[in-house]
A protein has these predicted regions:
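N-terminus-centric sequence/structural signature that marks the extreme N-terminus
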Residues: 1-98
Length: 98
């Protein structure tokens, strides 16, 4: 199971984000990534690769214009069907992208 951290409502300068993300390493030993927005929203993710082992499946994921960001730890078994139904052009093989 992957690790997820989200921090909001505080000035990020006052928080050791890297330390918090590192504490989740046992939950997702394959990779980690994070991003922050406007110095008051932070999202971090430690990855346990299952479906898409490439970097394309890494999270947090963002849409093309970076107005929407998401992290998901789950299994969407019919993700190919959902993507086809909604004509969604997937960039990865990750079920969470839909």
């Amino acid at each position: 199971m992957c690790g997820i951290i989200a921090i909001s409502g505080v000035e990020l300068d006052t928080i050791d984000q890297k330390r918090h993300l590192q504490s989740l390493h046992p939950r997702g030993p394959d990779a980690q990534d994070s991003f922050s927005y406007d110095n008051n929203v932070y999202m971090g993710f430690t990855r346990l690769s299952i479906n898409d082992l490439s970097s394309d499946g890494m999270q947090p994921m963002q849409n093309d214009d970076k107005t929407v960001s998401m992290i998901c730890n789950g299994e969407i078994y019919n993700y190919k069907e959902i993507a086809k139904k909604h004509n969604f052009n997937m960039k990865s093989k990750s079920d969470c992208e839909v």
